[in-house]
Each structure stands twice: as structure tokens, then as C-alpha cells.
UniProtKB/Swiss-Prot annotation:
One of its GO terms (biological process) is tail-anchored membrane protein insertion into ER membrane. Keywords: Coiled coil, Endoplasmic reticulum, Membrane, Transmembrane, Transmembrane helix, Transport. The lineage of its organism: Eukaryota, Fungi, Dikarya, Ascomycota, Pezizomycotina. It is a multi-pass membrane protein. Residues 1-4, 132-155 are lumenal. This is Protein get-1. It is found in: Endoplasmic reticulum membrane. Residues 190-214 are annotated as: Disordered. One of its GO terms (cellular component) is GET complex. Interacts with GET3. One of its GO terms (molecular function) is protein-membrane adaptor activity. The chain crosses the membrane at residues 5-24, 111-131, 156-172. Gene3D superfamilies: Helix hairpin bin. Required for the post-translational delivery of tail-anchored (TA) proteins to the endoplasmic reticulum. Acts as a membrane receptor for soluble GET3, which recognizes and selectively binds the transmembrane domain of TA proteins in the cytosol.
Amino acid sequence: MPSLLVVIFVIELFVQLVNTIGAATINNLLWRIALSLPLPLSAQFAAQRKKQKEYLAIRRELNATSSQDEFAKWARLRRQHDKLLEDLEKRKKELDAAKTKFDRTLTTVRVVATRGLQWFLPFWYSREPMFWLPYGWFPYYVEWFASFPRAPLGSVSIVVWQWACTGVIKLVIETVMAVVGLIVAARQKQQEKQKAKQAVPAAGGGDSKAEEAK
């Protein structure tokens, strides 16, 4: 069984990553992965794409056919067009319903695996010490706060450990994002400078040609 310290840290890390990336982005990524797997859903999606290609081909041919000069052909293409369009709309509704169900399932699993455990574990292990502070190193009020709410005095409670993990992970993520933002901004400025340097000789060349013409 993994240590409770590690479990709490992993849960908080996952929660912060979801908050940073975005639940909708993660759902869309997992949806694309599900469509690429050999599942009935992916077969349904492939059939829908195939029908869509057929529909576009019929539509192009229909637009290129005159309803006056080639009425019989135009009428046949029109029937095929309407039938494929109706089939596509039906398949789209089915896929949209499957996507909605998929998102709800993921949301439920994510809430249970994160928010549920965030509340359940501190309640269930509120009296369990995560680890002990060195004896006599800290004053009473520090030991009392570290053991909040019901852990033995002189220990670090699961609630305080959870707070510490959340704070440290947030700080690290914000630092990494700030560093990445600075790197991206620096590269953009460097590219702009290079473009400006490339534009200057062109302007200078035009002036020299004008002087020669004079």
C-alpha cells in the first residue's frame, strides 16, 4: 500500500494539473484517444466520416449538374443528397449524445477521484500523524497548528500536509509557467529583431538604386 503522504501529494498534483490544463481540454484529448482505439465508438465515428465524404462528393456533383439540362440526373443526385444529409444528421446526434455521456462519466470519475478523496481522506485519517516533528524544536503554537485539527500534538496532520502540498505544487506550477512565458516572449522578440534586420538592407538597397538613377 502506498504511503498516505505520497497519496495526498499525487491527488493534489493531479488536481492542480487539471486546474492548469483545463477539464474540457483533457476531456477532448481523451475523446480523441477513445476514437482512435478499436472500440464500437471509433467504428461509429469512422462510418460517420465515410458518410460525410460521400455526402460532400454528391454535393459537389449536384452543384455541377444543371436542373434544367440534366433533370433526371439532378433529381437522382438530389435524392441521394437528401438521404445522406438525413443520415449524417442522425449520426451526428448519436455521436453528440455519446460525447456528452463520455464527458459526464469523466467528470464523475474525476470528481470522485479528486474532490471526493480530498474530503474523505482528511476526515478518515484526521487522527493519524503523517510524520513527527523533532522534539523540542518548535514552540507549542507551531506544534498545535501542525497537528490541526485532531492529530497528536507534535505531529503533522493530514490536513496540514494537504495544505502544504497544495501550496508547494501551485508555486512550482506558477514558476514553471512564468519561466516558459519568459522564454517564449524572448524568442518572439528575437524573431522580430531578425525580421527587422532583414528588412533594413532591403530598404538601403532601394535608396542606393535611387541614387544611382540620379
